[in-house]
A protein has these predicted regions:
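An acidic-aromatic
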Residues: 79-130, 201
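Gly/Pro-enriched, hydrophobic low-complexity segments
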Residues: 143-152, 156-211
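Amphipathic hydrophobic-ligand
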Residues: 72-78, 178, 199
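N-terminal secretory signal peptides that target proteins for export/translocation
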Residues: 1-7
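N-terminal leader/targeting segments and the immediate start of mature chains
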Residues: 25-62, 66-72
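Short hydrophobic/aromatic-rich beta-strand segments that constitute the beta-sheet cores
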Residues: 61, 88-91, 107-110, 163-165, ...
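Bacterial N-terminal signal peptides
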Residues: 10-22
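Flexible, surface-exposed loop/linker segments and immediately adjacent secondary-structure boundaries
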Residues: 115-161
Length: 211
């Protein structure tokens, strides 16, 4: 699998932008009002609800891609952004500059090193479209839609949880073997994606000032 293609490169930032949140302020108070849940096993409903309650509009990331086509991991750094109501952006800043933007049903890819700017429609990529719809469902708290597209497995408690997603439909399976999210409360720490051919990508989110 080549994570450099538009289709697959858009998947990871999409996951992060639609799910990366932080429980702060009112959301944190809401969690406390329901008692201390840190010692109780969490469910997918609780994870999705926590992620829905709060999010950051900008977060830095470091992404490592492991592929049979590479002699060593490819590591890139950049910023993920969300602009309401539904614009998602991944900007790679190091070691080269690239930009991916998902707006409604359009995906735009820009690369300085490749001297290219291209826009595609999600209508032409059923597998990616199903992923988009599933994660939008996650952000809006629609657990039923998420379960419709993925087999979901949650382990851990509110302090430290993992959410494993495996596509149900053939289109999704052709693109992703699984997605594994790990985090605490309403924050995602890492997202790992494994492709059917064994290639994988791991993104670590870094809170703090963005470039």
């Amino acid at each position: 699998m080549n994570f450099g293609t538009i289709r697959n490169s858009c998947l990871l930032p999409l996951c992060v932008l639609l799910l990366a949140g932080s429980v702060t302020g009112e959301a944190a108070e809401s969690s406390l009002s329901h008692g201390d849940r840190s010692s109780n096993a969490w469910t997918v409903e609780q994870v999705v609800a926590s992620l829905k309650e709060g999010r950051e509009t900008s977060v830095s990331f470091e992404e490592a891609t492991y592929s049979s086509l590479l002699t060593e991991p490819l590591i890139v750094r950049g910023v993920l952004r969300f602009t309401p109501p539904a614009t998602l952006e991944k900007e790679v800043l190091e070691p080269y500059r690239e930009r991916y933007v998902i707006e409604e049903d359009r995906v735009t890819f820009e690369s300085e090193r490749k001297h290219v700017k291209k826009t595609i429609s999600l209508e032409d990529y059923p597998a990616l479209r199903s992923v988009v719809e599933a994660f939008r469902a996650s952000f809006t708290g629609d657990v039923a839609q998420l379960k419709k597209v993925y087999e979901t497995t949650v382990e851990g408690t509110s302090r430290e949880w993992t959410l494993l997603l495996r596509p149900h439909d053939p289109a999704g399976k052709s693109m992703v073997d699984y997605l594994l999210l790990s985090g605490s409360e309403g924050r995602i720490a890492t997202i790992a994606i494994r492709a059917p051919d064994g290639d994988r990508s791991v993104m670590t989110l870094r809170r703090g000032p963005s470039k």
